[in-house]
Curated annotation (Swiss-Prot):
May act to induce hypotension. Presents moderate hemolytic activity at physiological concentrations (micromolar range), and weak lactate dehydrogenase (LDH) release from mast cells. Does not induce mast cell degranulation, and antimicrobial effects. In vivo, injection into mice induces increase in nociceptive sensibility and causes moderate edema formation. It also reduces locomotion, suggesting an increase in anxiety, but causes no alteration in rearing (standing on hind limbs). Expressed by the venom gland. This is Cryptide Pep-11. GO terms for biological process: killing of cells of another organism. The keyword Secreted applies. The keyword Glycoprotein does not apply. It comes from the Eukaryota. Keywords: Cytolysis, Secreted. It comes from Tityus obscurus (Amazonian scorpion). It is found in: Secreted. One of its GO terms (cellular component) is extracellular region.
Length: 6
């Protein structure tokens, strides 16, 4: 699952 940058 691709997570957006923090």
């Amino acid at each position: 699952n691709a997570k957006p940058p923090a």
